């Protein structure tokens, strides 16, 4: 195995040496050479292949063609470059794009195929894929292959790439409750996610701190639960824009509404929803988690999640279920009476009762669900297709042991525990995130097939729009490559060179990505 890895490392290093630009994330299979072709910005075109199922009018690809032309060449005109005989023009200055299945008006899903093949040689410049989602990934790779000489001439090397993701779920979580993130910050994040081939935006919309989601069924939730009901909310149009913006980049929107804990912001808008806490025999004036003993709680949840199910088109909703503090439930005599009536002797049983009822409600709306690991740990009865997200890194249960237990029980798993980007420390902390191997647990091949990917999490206690971008990028890129590329792509020196280059490319694209070491970029951020 060591010899195999050394050979792979040498091969990758050789590939990097003959590429004028480095790719991020690294593709599964690549052949490239020093032979290069000139591109002319003034007449370069993206064009549909005659045999493609998608043609002009396919909004996903039409919009992508416009975006990538701008990313490559900008909006100005360029003088025609002079070139020697060794610099061969690239065909007719056209990238032909061919897809087998046109899904132009659909949404990406967990089963979407993102494979693509990119061929650049003397005879053709062709991007082939089974779906438009694969074509989007190939367009990003193509954009990273194009490079500009010191004289201002655009080139691309002779290249053959066959590429596909290692995991189908590659996400970023943004917390928009603890600090409100303007719509522009979310859209900007979606752009850079596409550059990194992420495909899931996990939107942690609400929490204890605020309820910025504008509910049309329960408008008081937003009016009384947001930081500011005018300036710090996401309107129905905002949510719709995020979903469509993400779709055009091949990104799913996984909405999270976490209950029964993390719900203090819900209380003012829905009287009676939260549990009143007691101090001795008297009400303390404070509130705890959702009250699981009242029928009105489940009536509300049924109506509310009917709305959510209609607003968010993805098959999956994230229902949370983490960090439920039992202190308030323990203090409340009505909760104690309810538990006695039900025969519950443990507050985890009460929590399980609530969550099981909620899961049944959501299932009735033909939705699947993702939950945090506590739902599994507390032995809540869930459907076999439930996805469990692992976030707890601390002992006594190390996260790989947790994944082993989850997959042994037959459930699919997502890994987030080692990828909390809101946590920062001095130095190149991206390296530790890059070194994580999601399948490094004892398990059968069938178990390991149940790990469907992971997410980088950006919790918002100390993050808002002022520091979101440099804290996310390019650090999140380490997770992007770990979830996309082969498990053999692990050489740290090779990764460092490519990530440094990619960080400079992000600056060129107007993204204020932080440095990963000492150095410089030809085009610094203030020059964009």
Swiss-Prot record:
Enzyme class: hydrolase
Subcellular location(s) per record: Lysosome
Keyword Hydrolase in annotation: yes
Catalytic site: 323 (proton donor)
Propeptide: 23-88
GO annotation, biological process: adult walking behavior; carbohydrate metabolic process; cell morphogenesis involved in neuron differentiation; dermatan sulfate proteoglycan catabolic process; ganglioside catabolic process; glycosaminoglycan biosynthetic process; glycosaminoglycan metabolic process; hyaluronan catabolic process
Keywords: Disulfide bond, Glycoprotein, Glycosidase, Hydrolase, Lipid metabolism, Lysosome, Signal, Zymogen
Signal peptide annotation: 1-22
EC number: 3.2.1.52
SUPFAM superfamilies: (Trans)glycosidases, beta-N-acetylhexosaminidase-like domain
Single Gene Ontology MF annotation: beta-N-acetylhexosaminidase activity
Disulfide linkage: 58-104, 277-328, 504-521
Regulation acting on activity, per entry: Addition of GM2A stimulates the hydrolysis of sulfated glycosphingolipid SM2 and the ganglioside GM2.
A UniProt-annotated Pfam family: Glycohydro_20b2
Family: Belongs to the glycosyl hydrolase 20 family.
Function: Hydrolyzes the non-reducing end N-acetyl-D-hexosamine and/or sulfated N-acetyl-D-hexosamine of glycoconjugates, such as the oligosaccharide moieties from proteins and neutral glycolipids, or from certain mucopolysaccharides. The isozyme S is as active as the isozyme A on the anionic bis-sulfated glycans, the chondroitin-6-sulfate trisaccharide (C6S-3), and the dermatan sulfate pentasaccharide, and the sulfated glycosphingolipid SM2. The isozyme B does not hydrolyze each of these substrates, however hydrolyzes efficiently neutral oligosaccharide.
Assembly notes: There are 3 beta-hexosaminidase isozymes: isozyme A (hexosaminidase A) is a heterodimer composed of one subunit alpha and one subunit beta (chain A and B); isozyme B (hexosaminidase B) is a homodimer of two beta subunits (two chains A and B); isozyme S (hexosaminidase S) is a homodimer of two alpha subunits. The composition of the dimer (isozyme A versus isozyme S) has a significant effect on the substrate specificity of the alpha subunit active site.
UniProt protein name: Beta-hexosaminidase subunit alpha
Origin species: Rattus norvegicus
């Amino acid at each position: 195995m060591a010899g195999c890895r050394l050979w792979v490392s040498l091969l990758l290093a050789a590939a990097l040496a003959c590429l004028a630009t480095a790719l991020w994330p690294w593709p599964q299979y690549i052949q490239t050479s020093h032979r290069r072709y000139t591109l002319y910005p003034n007449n370069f075109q993206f064009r549909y292949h005659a045999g493609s199922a998608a043609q002009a009018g396919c909004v996903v690809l039409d919009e992508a063609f416009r975006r990538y032309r701008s990313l490559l060449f900008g909006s100005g005109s360029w003088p025609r470059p002079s070139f020697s005989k060794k610099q061969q023009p690239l065909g007719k200055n056209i990238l032909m794009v061919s897809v087998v299945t046109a899904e132009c008006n659909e949404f990406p899903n967990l089963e979407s195929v993102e494979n693509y093949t990119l061929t650049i040689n003397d005879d053709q410049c062709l991007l082939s894929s089974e779906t438009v989602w694969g074509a989007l990934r190939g367009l990003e790779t193509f954009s990273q292959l194009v490079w500009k000489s010191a004289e201002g001439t655009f080139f691309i090397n002779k290249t053959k790439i066959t590429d596909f993701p290692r995991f189908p779920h590659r996400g970023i979580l943004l917390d928009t409750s603890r600090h409100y993130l303007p719509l522009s910050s979310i859209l900007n994040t979606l752009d850079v996610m596409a550059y990194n081939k992420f495909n899931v935006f996990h939107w942690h919309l609400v929490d204890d701190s605020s309820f910025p989601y504008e509910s049309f069924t329960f408008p008081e939730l937003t009016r009384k639960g947001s930081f500011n009901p005018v300036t710090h909310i996401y309107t129905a149009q905002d949510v719709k824009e995020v979903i469509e913006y993400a779709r055009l980049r091949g990104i799913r929107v996984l909405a999270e509404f976490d209950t029964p804990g993390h719900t203090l912001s819900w209380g003012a808008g829905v009287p009676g929803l939260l549990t009143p806490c007691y101090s001795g025999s008297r009400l303390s004036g404070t509130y705890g988690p959702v009250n699981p003993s009242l029928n009105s709680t489940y009536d509300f949840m049924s109506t509310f999640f009917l709305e959510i199910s209609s607003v968010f088109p993805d098959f999956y909703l994230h229902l949370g279920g983490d960090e439920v503090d039992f202190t308030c439930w323990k203090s409340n005599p009505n909760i104690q009476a309810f538990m006695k009536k039900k025969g519950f002797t443990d507050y985890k049983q009460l929590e399980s009762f609530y969550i099981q009822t909620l899961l049944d409600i959501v299932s009735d709306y033909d939705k699947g669900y993702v939950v945090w690991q506590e739902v599994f740990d507390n032995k809540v009865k869930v459907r076999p297709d439930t996805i469990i997200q692992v976030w707890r890194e601390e002992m006594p249960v190390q996260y790989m042991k947790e994944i082993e237990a989850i997959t042994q029980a037959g459930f699919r798993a997502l890994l987030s525990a080692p990828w909390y980007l809101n946590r920062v420390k001095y130095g190149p902390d991206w390296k530790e995130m890059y070194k994580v191997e999601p399948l490094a647990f004892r398990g059968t091949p069938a178990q390991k097939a149940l790990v469907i990917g992971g997410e980088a999490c950006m919790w918002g206690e100390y993050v808002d729009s002022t520091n979101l971008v440099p804290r996310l990028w390019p650090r999140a890129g380490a997770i992007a490559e770990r979830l996309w590329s082969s498990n053999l792509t692990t050489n740290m020196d090779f990764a460092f060179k490519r990530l440094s280059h990619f960080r400079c490319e992000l600056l060129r694209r107007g993204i204020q990505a932080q440095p990963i070491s000492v150095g410089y970029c030809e085009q610094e951020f203030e020059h964009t």
